[in-house]
Structures are given as structure tokens and as C-alpha cells.
Amino acid sequence: MYAITFDLDTQLLEDHYASASWRDAHMDIRKALDEFGFNWQQGSVYFGGDKVDAVTCVLAVQDLARRYDWFAPTVRDIRMLRIEEMNDLMPVVQKIAGIGG
């Protein structure tokens, strides 16, 4: 499984993003990545579906940079990750906190 994770400079985003709220930029990114088969996981982390490969990741990032003129100047860091195993650690947290099943 592949993932894309990124960090946007919110100060620059306020200056470059044309909409009323710079927070709308995250929804724009979510919609664009959805078109390439990515699902929002948390924050600025998107997991690719079964058909997403390394090439799809590169094409998706190229699309973001071309589609949104505010993207390139505001992105501080962006990574493609390959996830070998999907391990949910929430049961550990819940057990320590005494909550959950």
C-alpha cells in the first residue's frame, strides 16, 4: 500500500489561497487525491487503494501542483510512503486507558 503525506505552511497558505478560508485548501486536496484512488486517513495523510502504485503517487502530486497554483509555494514537505503492514495501535491505547472492548 502507498501513502502520500504532506505539510502545508499555513502562513503562506493564508497569503496564496484565493478562497475565504485557507482551510478549504485541505478539502481541495482531498477531492483531487480521491480522483487518483486515495482515501483520507488523518490530518494530511492519504492512503492509496489497491490500484495505487508509485506511478499513481507521482501523477497525483504532479496534478496537485498543476491544478492549484497555491500548492507548490505552500507545501513544506511531501512524501510518498510504502506501507508494508497496516497495524492499528488504537487497541493498545484503549487498553491502557481502560476503554473499549
Regions found by a protein language model. Name each.
Residues 2-3, 11-101:
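Basic nucleic-acid-binding interfaces
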Residues 6:
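Active-site flanking residues adjacent to catalytic metal/cofactor-binding acidic residues
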